[in-house]
């Protein structure tokens, strides 16, 4: 799999309209782990990641680096990647935050972030611009992105 990071087009965020979604994040958890991957909605995205209604340029709302897994339940490569994403959430607990976005339920959010291929992982460093990778990437590539993009060891 090619190791390709694509800068996120923030201009897409500027054309978003209001979207009403539930404010309660759902969690997805591996049964053997107490670390939870939070199911991200558009409203929670604006609170925890980027509030495009207030900010016209990228302004990360969080304190810790973030990985967002854009997926669909029917997507085979997404199902392959999911356990690895959960494993990274556990391994880097307290160092990064890991979210998941079901693109079928959160179409506006996926569209606003320019998501066209599944799975897509969005890496958001605490400072700097987000980057993404597409496809079911191997563990080594994911760990390299965490180290190089999120600057977490």
Feature locations, PLM:
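Structural signal for short hydrophobic segments within the conserved structured cores
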Residues: 38, 97-99, 130-133
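Non-catalytic, surface beta->alpha helical segment in thiol-disulfide oxidoreductase systems
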Residues: 117, 122-153
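C-type cytochrome heme c attachment motif
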Residues: 73-80, 120
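Short pre-active-site segment immediately N-terminal to redox-active cysteine/selenocysteine motifs
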Residues: 63-66, 70-74, 117
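N-terminal targeting signals for export/organelle localization
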Residues: 1-43, 153
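A short beta-strand-turn-helix
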Residues: 40-64
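Thiol-based oxidoreductase modules, predominantly thioredoxin-like and allied folds used
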Residues: 70, 81-89, 93-108, 115
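Loop/turn elements at helix/coil->beta-strand transitions in domains of secreted/extracellular proteins
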Residues: 63-66, 94-96, 126
